[in-house]
Amino acid sequence: MLTACAQQTKNETNMEFTDNVKEALSDNGRIDLNSLQWTREPGGFEVKGDTILITTAPKTDLWQRTYYHFQNDNAPVLQMKTREKFFSFVVKTDFIGSHHRFDQCGIVMYLGSENWLKGSVEYENDEFQHLGSVVTNNGYSDWATTAIPANVKTMWYRFSRREDDYCIECSSDGQAFSQMRICHMPAAADEISFGIYACSPEESSFTAIFSDMKITECAWKAHDGQQPD
């Protein structure tokens, strides 16, 4: 049975997964897709074994206020709930069909329209796309990005929780992960919802493929450098 970050702080030692996190683990350690719940079910989706395909609808998005001034909150989100304080969630995304500006798919922690985070690749043009993350606290979104080649069409993500702090990482092969974002969310202090999303903010549609979803011990280890004052 999995334990969460065993060898870390005393709160983590010998902690067993409970509630929906534990229930969602299938015999091989991957997530039972039947345990996930939709927020805004998409018009087109299909489950094939441990893979889910989501076909986006035009003008679907997640963004709140900052810079653009609009409030978009209609992207389909597929999640599970947990109160566990230490764990990691991993998923592989394939987006060979993305072709229009801002077409995107990735990981999400959606607590409601005013508080959420996401990590994804957003298509820009035939030269580059944005690998980035958005954190929305109290109704205002930010966006941190780096440019990657437009021919990248597969990305792994790892979402980790350490109490009320969160880390998003990405990987091209599902083995070596690189940090994208560390953040704190005041609204995510107890039960959270986390999972996957896909959307097309402009006049576009594509099919996003999610596979190899699993929950593991917390891969984001405790800080071992400078100590608090």
Where are these regions (language model features)?
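C-terminal motif of bacterial Sec signal peptides marking the signal peptidase cleavage site
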Residues: 3-4
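Extracellular glycan-recognition regions
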Residues: 12-229
